[in-house]
A protein has these predicted regions:
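Generic alpha-helical hydrophobic packing signal
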Residues: 21-22, 27-30, 45, 66-72
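Short, flexible micro-motifs
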Residues: 5, 59-60, 80
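Bulky hydrophobic/aromatic packing residues
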Residues: 26-27, 37, 100-103
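Short Fe-S-cluster ligation motifs
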Residues: 56-71, 95-103
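Histidine-centered nuclease catalytic patch
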Residues: 33-67
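Arg/Lys-rich, low-complexity, intrinsically disordered N-terminal tails that contact nucleic acids
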Residues: 1-10, 85-103
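Short, charged surface segments at domain edges that flank catalytic/cofactor-binding sites
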Residues: 1-34
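Short Cys/His-centered divalent metal-binding micro-motifs
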Residues: 34, 65-91
């Protein structure tokens, strides 16, 4: 029997991760997490492995696990990414092109 299906251990890990620093911030996009959303919602909270299980990561090692949005986790897939990999670039949302060459 694999460790991946042990939902009680994963839920306990989710509670521990919530208590750590940045427990309310998505590890990949650095945006706030909403724990009240239903499980299938794109912005619901999931546990993601920094080194995916498919690449040898341990799904029950708290150092390898982080809280993320469901959509960020689906986008990541089976890749190893660093913290904030999907964070918007500084000033990207507020800066508007000043000339047509920048469009």
């Amino acid at each position: 029997m694999g460790t991946r299906g042990n939902s009680r251990r994963r839920e306990a890990m989710k509670r521990r991760l919530m208590m750590l620093d940045d427990g309310d911030i998505c590890w990949l996009c650095l945006r706030p997490l909403d724990f009240s959303l239903p499980a299938k919602h794109p912005l619901s909270v999931e546990i993601d492995e920094e080194v995916p299980v498919g690449l040898g990561g341990d799904p029950l090692d708290i150092e390898n696990c982080h809280l993320v949005h469901r959509a960020c986790n689906l986008r990541k897939g089976c890749k190893v990414l660093h913290r904030g990999a999907y964070a918007p670039a500084a000033g990207a949302a507020t800066r508007r092109p000043s000339t047509s060459r920048e469009w």
